[in-house]
């Protein structure tokens, strides 16, 4: 857990499916905004790197994406993303202005057990990037969204209806096919949850 940033997703108790959806939406928006601004990829968005703080259930957040102002609910949980050690981003205009971590230097990262979603996610990232870690490949963000949805379904216990569970399972499946967090933001599970307005 991070002192000022809240408790990590691994250790916090979610109260309901609305909190789970709001958490996923906030992570998706944050990644999509960073993709647009800096061609950002987190590349290590496991449960310990998603911090949650309790806030007012009616609190909303705002973000600017593609020239549009987005407003979206927290449902009582504010998200902070931490640990950018493995991340990739553009810091300028030239190829030499890319900050990234060469994950090939840590082969153990790819040797975790098959069927373990976090280990599988590292391997899926390697396949998506073709092992060229400086290259911008926002699909890695979508792969971590799939991972987070998987963890919500398999590792976290909170009340949800059959319909809410089906929505989460559907998002998990669709996230594997998305090319970016920006694309995931338009998922059926999120459409109608966030609002937009031209600035």
Describe each region flagged by the PLM.
Residues 1-20, 91-102:
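Conserved structural core of kinase catalytic domains
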Residues 41, 46-124, 128-131:
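Catalytic activation segment of kinase domains across protein kinase-like and atypical kinase folds
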Residues 2, 9, 27, 31-34, ...:
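Structural signal for hydrophobic/aromatic residues that build the beta-strand cores
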Residues 114-199:
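Helical subdomain adjoining the active site within ATP-dependent kinase catalytic cores
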């Amino acid at each position: 857990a991070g002192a000022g940033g809240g408790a990590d997703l691994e250790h916090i108790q979610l109260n309901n499916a609305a909190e789970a959806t709001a958490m996923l939406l906030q992570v998706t928006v944050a990644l999509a905004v960073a993709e647009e601004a800096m061609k950002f990829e987190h590349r290590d968005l496991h449960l310990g790197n998603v911090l949650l703080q309790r806030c007012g259930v009616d609190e909303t957040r705002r973000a600017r994406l593609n020239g549009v102002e987005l407003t979206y609910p927290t449902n009582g949980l504010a998200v902070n993303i931490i640990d950018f050690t493995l991340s990739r981003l553009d810091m300028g205009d030239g190829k030499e202005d890319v900050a990234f971590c060469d994950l090939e230097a840590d082969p153990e990262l790819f040797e975790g057990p098959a069927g373990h979603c976090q280990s599988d996610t590292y391997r899926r990232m390697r396949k998506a990037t073709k092992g060229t870690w400086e290259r911008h490949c926002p699909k890695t963000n979508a792969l971590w969204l799939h991972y987070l949805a998987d963890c919500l379904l398999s590792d976290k216990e909170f009340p949800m209806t059959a319909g809410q569970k089906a929505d989460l399972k559907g998002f998990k499946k669709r996230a594997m096919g998305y090319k970016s967090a920006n694309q995931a933001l338009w998922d059926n599970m999120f459409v109608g949850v966030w609002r937009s307005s031209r600035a």
